[in-house]
């Protein structure tokens, strides 16, 4: 059984997407998703707040929530998905929960998350 576990671990490490920075729940992120339309493939931007991160290894995924025309839209992305081009962190949110389900009931400015002051490492 130990050999099977090691094999699964090695495969999940190879499947890990290297273009994803580490982020937490409450962070505002830009998710660049590869979309195939007919023969063409383009990259589409999906910007929102990370509401949850779940799973581990190759099954790890995260959910991003955004407001589109006044309607809340949530989309779940697997970390190991080949459709993910890259993930950029826009703001680091200051939250005390790992699952932000309470944002679903909030509207307007109440649904905003306070951001931490982050020093840029430009040098």
From Swiss-Prot:
InterPro entries named among the record's database cross-references: Ribosomal_bL19, Ribosomal_bL19_CS, Ribosomal_bL19_sf, Translation_prot_SH3-like_sf
GO CC annotations, alphabetized: cytosolic large ribosomal subunit
Pfam family, any one: Ribosomal_L19
Keywords, comma-separated and alphabetical: Ribonucleoprotein, Ribosomal protein
GO biological process, one term: translation
Domain of life where this protein originates: Bacteria
Keyword Lipid metabolism on entry: no
Gene Ontology MF terms in the entry: structural constituent of ribosome
Function: This protein is located at the 30S-50S ribosomal subunit interface and may play a role in the structure and function of the aminoacyl-tRNA binding site.
Family under the similarity heading: Belongs to the bacterial ribosomal protein bL19 family.
UniProt-recorded name of the protein: Large ribosomal subunit protein bL19
The organism of origin for this protein: Bdellovibrio bacteriovorus (strain ATCC 15356 / DSM 50701 / NCIMB 9529 / HD100)
